[in-house]
């Protein structure tokens, strides 16, 4: 008989598999992918109902941090999807409302179900091995792309040799690979260290270099630097040396945040970067709109980028400014509060379980860094959120009994 954990892993993997190809723009099955999301949510809800009847499902009597975060996400969606709708933007807002609604349903139900069944291991494992299957398949079926990889051109300001292994945009492949590497680190550090997972990490690294996605590569570097920064206490250093190293790491991260994804030299950054239009066009348009508190209206980055709205903005390639411009001061305040909630919870987790807390902070820092260059911030149209947001939500309330508890220990505590 298949266990509930097995059913969850299978359906969660199917959801991720469909999302990977849909968001990549290469989904070819005749079935409407939205039905897969609806079916997935329906299955988990039905299983939860059965568990409640059998008294196998934990019902919390008090509001958890995860519940508060979920309410903020839902509140943002409801406020700007149904209340503060800009009439000229209504058709675009409706599309966002549907996409974001399905996304939130899938992610929040996943997090709640996994947390209350103690399936954190299953979430990490299903994500890692689903991506592994996709990358392996795409690598084999597009093997000729390997010959076009040119590592030396990754930082070339004029041209880069880039391949996508059949997965849409190069940056999409880069994001998928960087996420796979981080998930692999979680698995190898806390669950197992088999050679197959190491092989998958190596494969993802090769494909990441092929994508030549600077955002993804620098995001991984930020992850590594943040993890090292908080791991310094494990090593014997004089305080002055430790302080110098920590200041250096902070400086490197700040420099990368400012210049990491630029397409040009540092000297010509503000003059030539495509993202300069955020400050020269998009923000002035926003401030002149008389909608600074509630924003210009929800619409995808592509709609704004092609100036299909009544407002001239060009591409809003920054998750924070995108949130400000589309949902105003109220919207950005909600998301900033959500970010602070995550950071405070992970800091508390670090004090209780150093290894888990450090990985949580490092992974979330990479996520925040990536939002500097793309509209990834809690965006249902971005695969990164399907892969990491359930993990982020579960970790909000994760508390270990001892410092040495690992993901393997979590797997032992089953109902």
Where are the model-predicted features located?
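N-terminal signal-anchor transmembrane segment
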Residues: 1-55, 76-84, 367-371
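Hydrophobic transmembrane alpha-helices and their immediate junctions
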Residues: 64-65, 194, 221-225, 229-233, ...
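Aromatic-anchored transmembrane helix interface
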Residues: 67-78, 89-113, 122-128, 132-135
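Membrane-interfacial entry segments at the cytosolic side of transmembrane helices
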Residues: 119-126, 193-197, 234-247
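Alpha-helical transmembrane segments of multi-pass inner-membrane proteins
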Residues: 122-149, 166-230
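A membrane-periplasm/extracellular boundary helix in multi-pass inner-membrane enzymes
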Residues: 140-142, 228-270, 283-288
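Transmembrane alpha-helices of multi-pass inner-membrane enzymes
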Residues: 182, 361-370, 376-415
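Long extracytoplasmic/lumenal interhelical loops at the membrane interface
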Residues: 266-327
């Amino acid at each position: 008989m298949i266990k509930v954990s097995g059913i969850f892993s299978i359906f969660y993997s199917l959801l991720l598999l469909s999302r990977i190809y849909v968001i990549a723009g290469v989904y070819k099955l005749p079935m409407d992918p939205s039905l897969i999301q609806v079916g997935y949510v329906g299955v988990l809800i039905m299983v939860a109902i059965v568990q409640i009847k059998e008294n196998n499902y934990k019902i919390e009597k008090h509001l958890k941090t995860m519940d508060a975060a979920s309410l903020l996400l839902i509140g943002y969606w409801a406020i700007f999807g149904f209340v503060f709708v800009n009439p000229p933007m209504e058709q675009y807002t409706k599309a966002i409302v549907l996409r974001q609604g399905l996304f939130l349903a899938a992610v929040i139900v996943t997090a709640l179900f996994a947390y209350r069944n103690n399936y954190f291991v299953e979430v990490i494992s299903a994500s890692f091995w689903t991506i592994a299957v996709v990358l392996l398949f795409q690598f084999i079926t597009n093997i000729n792309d390997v010959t076009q990889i040119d590592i030396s051109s990754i930082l070339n300001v004029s041209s880069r040799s880039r391949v996508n292994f059949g997965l849409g945009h190069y940056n999409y492949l880069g994001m998928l690979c960087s996420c796979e590497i981080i998930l692999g680190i979680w698995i190898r550090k806390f669950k197992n260290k088999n050679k197959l997972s190491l092989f998958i990490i190596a494969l993802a690294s090769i494909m990441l270099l092929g994508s030549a996605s600077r955002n993804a590569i620098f995001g991984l570097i930020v992850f590594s630097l943040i993890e090292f920064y908080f791991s310094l206490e494990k090593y014997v250093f004089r305080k002055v040396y430790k302080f110098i190293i920590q200041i250096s790491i902070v400086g490197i991260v700040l420099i990368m945040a400012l210049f990491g994804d630029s397409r040009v030299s540092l000297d010509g950054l503000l003059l030539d970067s495509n993202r300069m239009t955020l400050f020269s066009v998009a923000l002035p348009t926003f401030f002149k709109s008389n909608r600074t508190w509630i924003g210009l209206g929800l619409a995808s980055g592509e709609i704004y980028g092609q100036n299909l709205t009544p407002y001239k903005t060009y591409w809003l390639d920054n998750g924070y400014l995108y949130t400000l411009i589309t949902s105003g001061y109220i919207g950005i305040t909600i998301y900033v509060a959500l970010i602070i909630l995550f950071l405070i919870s992970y800091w508390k987790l670090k004090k209780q379980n150093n290894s888990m807390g450090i990985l949580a902070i490092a992974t979330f820092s990479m996520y925040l860094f990536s939002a500097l260059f793309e509209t990834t911030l809690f965006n249902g149209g971005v695969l990164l959120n399907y892969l990491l947001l359930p993990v982020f939500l579960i970790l909000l309330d994760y508390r270990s009994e001892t410092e040495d508890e690992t993901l393997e220990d979590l797997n032992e505590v089953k109902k």
